[in-house]
Amino acid sequence: MSVYVRRLRSEDLPSVLRISKWLHENSRYQVFTYNEEKVEHLLSLSLNPDSPVFVVVALQKGSDEIMGYFHGYVDFHYFSDMKYAGDWAVCVLPLHRKYAPKILRLMVQAFEKWADKNGAKEVSIGASTEAYGTGYKKFLQRMGYRDVGFLAVKGR
């Protein structure tokens, strides 16, 4: 199967919003309300090419079906006036998981290229959904990322 990624277009928003809702419902984030208007706003920011927000979608050549998306940003580091890039959401739908290594590689490479262009000194990608296996971490390590810590949560 031939897969490619491209920047988000306004006509992609309904599909990406459905994927984001699925991700919300199938992750630890389901304890939080889902604010579709907020998510749509954050996704839409990437439609401006000068925005510090980035979204790519993955598609199969010859199809309009979105297989997954990567939503990231560039911001100034807490300690510095230098920029870093991070991710807000990364999702490949279960139906397309057999293509996940290729889809993720293309999405991460596109994000890294965009982050470089936007002056990021570092790229940080993580997983906190509790909806992933060990494969994603291993994939990121093969892409040159290192494990730098952990995230602990406590519900209320």
Regions found by a protein language model. Give the residues of each.
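Conserved acyl-CoA
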Residues: 106-121
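A short, internal acetyl-CoA/4′-phosphopantetheine-binding micro-motif in the GNAT/acyltransferase core
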Residues: 88-100
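Conserved GNAT-fold acetyl-CoA-binding loop/helix
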Residues: 24-43
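A short helix-loop-beta-strand connector motif used in the catalytic cores of GNAT acetyltransferases and
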Residues: 44-57
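A conserved beta-turn-beta hairpin within the catalytic core of GNAT-like acetyltransferases
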Residues: 76-87, 146-147
